[in-house]
């Protein structure tokens, strides 16, 4: 082991003495399968490398990971040692245990001269390692622009993808590298390529919140509507995560401010956010609201997540305030159910209709009452006094509405009186208002 240690540590004199005495087997390897030549090449000790080769060391001997002295020299950018070993017949068509060729290795370490040499010598420009990565994908991942340009000039497939389905553009966007992203787009990469998760470069840019790259992608016709298998598109992601600049960018490039999700068989077991509210009263379950439900607009989604500034941006852009989702819910239903007083107030000030009922014949005020949001109830009564007369928890079934014009039965009157009493106890109605409404019911 002393000879290998001497070579590894660059102790030239000791190595020379041992070699001169011919007491050393230069083919001896350590527990990793590495010879003295591996270590000398790794450190770039050219004089020792030459003595070992002259003494009979195998320039193509592979250690337990398939790495040769030439591989070690390339790994550490030992250009002179690399040149010498190749002069001595070192093979360049080797791969390590991960399947990386010398072209993969030099692309990762940004050794342009060696990349050019290996390409000239015929190494496959689109060779794959065990992860199906090409040298181009490696160069993009490590942000080596000159290497990328060299590989492309030799015909590298720009849209080759790895085992995850990621291609060069997705990798460059994921690393927030604007210059390389622009280079790839100018080289006509597929801007709407999707990986195995259904992610596009546009979605990755949205996840990163990178407005500059998002703008560049849109200018190259990236599709902002493409969704993952879970129904997440750049639009919904930006709105869900309160990325106002990105939503503004999308609106500037043609997104309809009332854009909504169409009905689909892949929707959750719950029909809507409101359904979840009703099924989880008093619980602390986390509602998975990453994807929108059928019919939900951008405004619904912003309010569902409590994003006041996003809701204001959409309203200022002309969003329809009373638009319904497929369950008949307005944005006001969402805000009331979510306990967002400021948003409720903003919606009412923008003309939200508090008298609209959903498919379950519930008003926004019903959900405020259901969850004990008394201040929101007061707001809704203030802006729409007619809601005071409606039962707070259950709506009157549609088949009974015709008979209400003639008179209510005893049970419905009793329920209405109880509801009025709740409003009185909560301080929402004064005693005088209570008496007036009571007389109306009993008339």
Task: Enumerate the language-model features and the residues they cover.
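Ankyrin repeat boundary/linker residues
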Residues: 30, 63, 96, 129, ...
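Ankyrin-repeat-protein effector appendages
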Residues: 2-5, 121, 154, 187, ...
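Conserved ankyrin/ankyrin-like repeat signature
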Residues: 14, 48, 80-81, 114, ...
């Amino acid at each position: 082991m002393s000879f290998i240690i001497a070579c590894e540590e660059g102790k030239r004199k000791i190595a020379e003495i041992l070699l001169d005495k011919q007491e050393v087997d230069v083919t001896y390897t350590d527990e990793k399968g590495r010879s003295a030549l591996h270590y000398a090449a790794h450190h770039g000790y050219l004089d020792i490398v030459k003595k070992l080769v002259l003494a009979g060391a195998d320039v193509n001997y592979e250690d337990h990971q398939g790495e040769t002295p030439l591989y070690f020299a390339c790994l550490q950018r030992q250009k002179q040692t690399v040149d010498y070993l190749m002069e001595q017949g070192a093979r360049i068509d080797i791969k390590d245990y991960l399947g990386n060729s010398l072209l993969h290795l030099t692309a990762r370490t940004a050794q342009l001269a060696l990349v050019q040499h290996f390409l000239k010598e015929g190494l496959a420009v689109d060779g794959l390692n065990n992860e199906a990565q090409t040298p181009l994908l490696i160069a993009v991942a490590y942000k080596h622009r000159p290497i990328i340009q060299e590989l492309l000039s030799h015909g590298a497939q720009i849209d080759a993808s790895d085992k995850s389905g990621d291609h060069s553009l997705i990798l460059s966007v994921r690393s927030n590298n604007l210059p390389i992203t622009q280079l790839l787009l100018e080289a006509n990469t597929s801007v709407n390529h999707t990986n195995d998760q259904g992610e596009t470069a546009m979605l990755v840019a949205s996840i990163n919140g990178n407005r500059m790259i998002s703008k560049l992608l849109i200018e190259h016709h990236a599709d902002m509507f493409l969704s993952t298998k879970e129904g997440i598109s750049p639009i919904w992601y930006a709105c869900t995560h309160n990325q106002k600049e990105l939503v503004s960018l999308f609106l500037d490039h043609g997104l309809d401010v009332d854009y909504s999700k169409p009905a689909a068989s892949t929707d959750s077991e719950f029909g809507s956010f409101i359904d979840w509210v009703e099924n989880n009263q008093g619980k602390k379950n986390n509602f998975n609201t990453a994807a929108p439900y059928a019919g939900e607009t951008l405004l619904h989604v912003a309010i569902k997540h409590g994003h006041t500034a996003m809701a204001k941006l959409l309203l200022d852009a002309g969003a329809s305030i009373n638009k319904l989702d497929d369950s008949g819910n307005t944005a006001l239903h969402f805000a009331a159910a979510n306990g967002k007083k400021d948003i409720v107030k903003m919606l009412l000030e923008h003309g939200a209709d508090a008298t609209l009922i959903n498919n379950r014949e519930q008003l926004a005020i019903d959900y405020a009452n259901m969850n004990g949001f008394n201040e929101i109830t007061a707001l809704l009564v203030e802006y729409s006094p007619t809601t005071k007369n409606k039962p707070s928890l259950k709506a009157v079934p549609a088949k009974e509405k015709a008979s209400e014009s003639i008179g209510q039965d005893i049970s419905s009157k009793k329920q209405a009186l109880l509801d009025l009493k709740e409003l009185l106890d909560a301080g929402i109605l004064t005693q005088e208002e209570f008496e007036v409404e009571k007389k109306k019911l009993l008339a």
